């Protein structure tokens, strides 16, 4: 069975964890920003169904 020969240093561990946290924070920030732009009506990059569109589909 494959086993690491040496223990990973604390600084390397902390660096990897910090990088992962940075990526997670960036993704969360982007999601929050997209949600805010949708709620304020400023989103122009994509379309999503509204009540007016639903009524047109029924007819």
From Swiss-Prot:
Per the record, a Pfam family? Ribosomal_L32p
One GO biological process term: translation
Q: Does the keyword Ribonucleoprotein apply?
A: yes
Q: Region Disordered: what ranges?
A: 1-59
Q: Which GO terms describe its cellular component?
A: large ribosomal subunit
Write down the PANTHER family for this protein, in alphabetical order: 50S RIBOSOMAL PROTEIN L32, CHLOROPLASTIC, LARGE RIBOSOMAL SUBUNIT PROTEIN BL32C
Q: Which family does it belong to?
A: Belongs to the bacterial ribosomal protein bL32 family.
Q: What is this protein called?
A: Large ribosomal subunit protein bL32
